[in-house]
Amino acid sequence: MRETQFGRKEIMSKDEYLITDAPLKALTVFAMPMILGSFFQQVYNMADSIIVGQFVGSSALAAVGACAALTNVFICVALGAGVGAGVLVSRYFGAKNYGKMKTIVSTSLISFLVLSVVLGVFGFSFSRAMMSGLQTPADILEDAVLYLRVYFVGFPFLFMYNILSTMFTSIGESRIPLGLLIFSSILNIFMDLWMVAGLGLGVFGAALATLIAQGISAVFSFLIFLYRMRQYKSPFKRFDRQELASMLRIAVPSVLQQSTVSIGMMIVQAVVNPFGTQALAGYAATMRVENVFSLIFVSIGNAVSPYISQNLGAKKIDRLKKGYHAALVLDLCFAVIAFAVIETLHTQISSLFLGKDGTALAYQVSGDYMRWLGYFFIFMGIKMATDGVLRGLGIMRPFLIANMVNLAIRLSVALLCAPRYGIAFVWLAVPAGWLANFLVSYAALRRSWPTENAAAPQ
């Protein structure tokens, strides 16, 4: 216990290890539950694809996969919104200003709940128009629209769960989100099997199973986080417009970056769709696999952000570069693992999604795309770590520019070359975009490292 600036007693948080332990140890302890959580998040997402592909067929798999690029846009709005709140929560937590921290939490939950309902209504209302605009093949359009509409009914649950997960990690707690993800992933798989294989509900059953699992997970997350916040007795405001403005200054560039990249992937999806249902099935299968491995590196980047922000808030400037270097070490280790797994098991991994119904074209597209990514995941790793440091420091403009460069390379090659020279050009430019992103971010970071006189928020 200790006395606070408000004259109240406050607990010493066990989650302050990010500002006390050795950087590599602290990041490893913090990141590993996030990495495991990312794995279960993808198990959660892939359950629909695997079960639909195995029990309904490759056309149904293509319908679910065709929704992925669009749903990612809306997910990225949630993730980007969480960044703005998370950076400030971490910094106030590091500075031990728990009243401001709780004000940020309350303000963000109220604001983003309203936003999630608005986006859910919009997405449900325009599902058919959006899928038609993506040139979704006619034979899978109805299933894709059905899946998407059920998804948007549950969107507020997904949105709030992602915001709450960011809040947990911002205070150095990565184990609770992991436990909730494991629970919801297992629940989602059982419900998928029951509704798709047992009841024969097809893509509707897969979407409904996901909605129910997300809803239960979001409710549990809220109740647990509410309990945690009550341990900090400092007074706070339920809603603060000035703090909302501070969040938005960080969140808006992140939302723009993540949403624009996802919109770019929607455009890439539109490039892939004319190649036919089987090519789309192979592409969708590897997109799921890419998400599994990429979220490992995303998790490390997400772990380094609160590490940087908490240490900046605590004025421990000497620990910032050490944390960045520790993140790069973790990225290298996982890049080697990803390469080994993909190079050895790419055919078996593809078969999980495509099953016996997949054609030679679907397997070729999936295998070629997957192996190419395996060679260059290290570029994604160093990009994510550098971006994570920029976010933790609140340096958002170079972060946004770097990611736009990445997107421009991927889009230009896909749009100009794929229709003329073949579908392979959809993925050939991916590592070049990652590398360019890293170089721009790193150049900005070298100019922006805080000095010992950097101020923490009060």
Mark where each language-model region is.
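Small-residue-rich hydrophobic transmembrane alpha-helices
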Residues: 61-121, 158-177, 282-346, 380-394, ...
